[in-house]
Amino acid sequence: MQAMLSDKKGRVLIIEPGLGYRLEKAQYSLITNYSILSPEITKPYIVSDDDRFERADELLKHCNDSFSVAEAFQILKSVKQEGIWATRVSFVYSVNENRVYYVENNDFEYVTKHQFCNSY
């Protein structure tokens, strides 16, 4: 299990209980179904041919500064998992808008958004 927390300053905290955490401030951040901090621990549990993290990472490396929420969802749609282990929720956080967008159960036609207040 892991969590990713982001703020409007572009900082990202990836937490993996029992393993630790990593603080990032990069153009983008990703997590997947296996451990980012210690991938060797979860390697035996990875579904064969699950290279979604690597494919998404490669696509994001080629994006420019005008990268949009819609483009982020195109990438997530292209790497979604289907079947018994289908992707249940895909999140995109926009630092510029201080807003989270998400899609449930691979229904990329219906994007829900949540606006955070700007109180700090």
Indicate residue ranges for each PLM-predicted region.
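Phosphate-interacting basic helix/loop segments used at nucleotide- and nucleic-acid interfaces
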Residues: 1
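C-terminal, well-structured catalytic/ligand-binding subdomain of enzymes
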Residues: 4-120
